[in-house]
Amino acid sequence: KNMRFATRESHSTLCDYLRLARGPHYARDGFFLRAESTYNVASEIDRLKSSGGNGELFMKSYGGVSLHNQSHGESFMAIMKNRFSGHGLYILDEPEAALSPSRQMAMLALMKRLVDQDSQFIISTHSPILMAYPEAEIIELDETGFRSTPYKETTHYRLTNYFLNNTEQMLNELM
């Protein structure tokens, strides 16, 4: 809503089949964030700050510190903590790319706080940690289409679980 930029047209044709419809209880906030675009968001915030006007106020809504002065994961979490205000629709594309396992767990707690404030998340992820969010509807997408899948039946959960429980065997097979 406030930032629209593209360094490359990289969206899939899936967007041609999606339609967001606003109901009577519409979101008052929203954000679409790809882990790999965090750098561009940080650069735009810095540009707005240096251009004067409301730039300083805008910077405060992202934590008051340049996101470039933080690690990738810290800046991603700063966006979620400071910019996501509740009563929103937040669309995140592979946030685990920026986050360590412990930060993914911190993200679950932050999501819970925002969900309790009437927010909704749509997340594209390969992370079994993020998929574990209680009562999440997990839609698994593969070459045959998409389907609702229980958490422990997802491909990513099963593969990660198998690897962690059979590490030596898996490493021998892989190497």
Residue ranges and their predicted role:
Residues A27, S85-G86, D118:
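Short, well-ordered loop/turn elements at secondary-structure boundaries
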Residues K1-S50:
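ABC ATPase nucleotide-binding domain signature region
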Residues E96-A97:
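Short loop immediately C-terminal to the Walker-B catalytic DE motif
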Residues A42-Q70:
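Conserved P-loop NTPase mechanochemical-coupling segment
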Residues Y90-D93, Q120-T125:
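Structural recognition of the conserved hydrophobic beta-strand(s) that form the central parallel beta-sheet
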Residues Y62, S66, Q70-L92, S102-L108, ...:
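GG-anchored amphipathic helix commonly corresponding to the ABC/SMC/Rad50 NBD signature/C-loop
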Residues S102-Q120, S127-M175:
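C-terminal lobe/lid and adjacent interdomain/linker elements of RecA-like ASCE P-loop ATPase modules
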Residues S12-L14, L18, S66-L67, A78, ...:
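Conserved phosphate-binding elements of NTP-dependent enzyme cores
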